[in-house]
Regions:
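Cytoplasmic helix-loop-helix junction between adjacent transmembrane helices
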Residues: 106-143
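Conserved MFS/SLC helix-loop-helix module at the cytosolic interface between two early adjacent transmembrane helices
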Residues: 62-98
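Small-residue-rich segments within alpha-helical transmembrane domains of MFS-like 12-TM solute carriers
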Residues: 25, 29, 111-119, 150
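Helix-breaking motifs and short loop linkers at transmembrane-helix boundaries and internal kinks
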Residues: 43, 96-101
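Short hydrophobic/small-residue motifs within alpha-helical transmembrane segments
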Residues: 56-58, 146-147
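Pair of pore-lining "gating" transmembrane helices in MFS-fold secondary transporters
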Residues: 9-30
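Paired small-residue
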Residues: 90, 101-109
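Helix-loop-helix hairpin linking two adjacent transmembrane segments in secondary transporters
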Residues: 133, 140-178
Length: 178
């Protein structure tokens, strides 16, 4: 292996893993450990919590389908930063509301942006890896999701005693900002 390519490979994999950590773990999966606390805080009922999750799932499906529409590399390079920005903005706005309808809308938008990023970021990275003869490293980008699951659990449980309601989204937002 050419040592000159190692730093580039590491940068590409780490960047991709961090993007997936932000959108998929902090944007999507953190809702699972947050939900019982949001119910306990009176922000959501059990039914509302399920409805909010369903809006996010619908958004994710919609985003994944939209991502297939924007499949050329130049389209991905254009759409990906916007989708990532929207995802982080949704997480920020979730820190400001306990309104069920607004939270449902934000989770829908979060899901759409997540679906786009989750399809497009690995595609862009795979294209780069293939061009540099390193396609076998493509699975490493998903370490962001796995590692992020562990991180998100801590982001919910560690501040659980001193955050409440919409404040519980703050740790996810703060970690999402570059």
């Amino acid at each position: 292996m050419n040592n000159n390519k190692t730093p580039d490979l590491l940068k590409v994999i780490v960047a991709g893993a961090l993007v997936l950590l932000v959108v998929h773990t902090l944007g999507r999966f953190i809702y699972t450990p947050l939900l019982p606390l949001l119910i306990q805080d009176g922000v959501l009922t059990v039914k509302q919590g399920a409805d909010v999750a369903s809006w996010n799932y619908l958004g994710y499906l919609t985003g994944a389908v939209l991502a297939m529409r924007w499949h050329r590399i130049e389209q991905i390079r254009s759409v990906l930063p916007w989708a990532l920005g929207i995802n982080v903005l949704c997480t920020l706005l979730q820190t400001q509301t306990e309104n069920f309808e607004l939270l449902s809308f934000l989770r829908l938008a979060n899901g759409i942006s997540n679906g786009i990023v989750f399809v497009q970021a690995p595609a862009l990275i795979l294209e780069w890896l293939a061009r540099h003869g390193r396609a076998s490293a493509s699975g490493l980008v998903y370490l962001g999701v796995g590692g992020g699951l562990i991180v998100s659990s801590g982001l919910v449980s560690l501040p659980a005693d001193f955050l409440s309601g919409a404040q519980r989204w703050w740790p996810a937002f703060l970690l999402s900002v570059p």
